[in-house]
């Protein structure tokens, strides 16, 4: 299986490589196809992300994106916003679960609970 890997900026490169190493250690059949995006890439090219990235995500159906920086006050809109607009994905969906031994306002929340937030 092929999947797009977008390492991103700063620590993104490090943690993305860790994910690649983990998938290899687990003998998962993933061929990572790397594309660049983020502030570091934009500083070199004046583009938010590498040409072909959107087409690769459409083709492979899977992508892992590391953290990306966004210049404040100047430059481009965030990589997250650009990708959300390209793919019309505006929902931020998060699973919610309670853990035994951890006090919280709500107890016994199963993994079947979800938080939905609109992302623009």
Placement of each model-derived feature along the sequence:
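N-terminal phosphate-binding or glycine-rich loops at protein starts, especially the Walker A/P-loop
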Residues: 1-36
């Amino acid at each position: 299986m092929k999947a797009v890997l977008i390492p991103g900026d700063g620590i993104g490169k490090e943690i993305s490589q860790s994910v690649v190493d983990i998938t290899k250690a687990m003998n998962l059949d993933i061929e990572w196809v790397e594309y660049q995006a983020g502030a570091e890439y934009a500083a070199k090219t004046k583009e938010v992300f590498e040409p072909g990235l959107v087409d690769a995500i459409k083709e492979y159906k899977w992508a892992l994106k590391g953290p990306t920086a966004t210049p404040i006050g100047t430059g481009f809109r965030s990589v997250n916003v650009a990708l959300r607009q390209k793919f019309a994905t505006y929902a931020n969906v998060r699973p919610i679960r309670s853990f035994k031994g951890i006090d919280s306002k709500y107890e016994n929340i199963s993994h079947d609970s979800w938080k939905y937030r609109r992302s623009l």
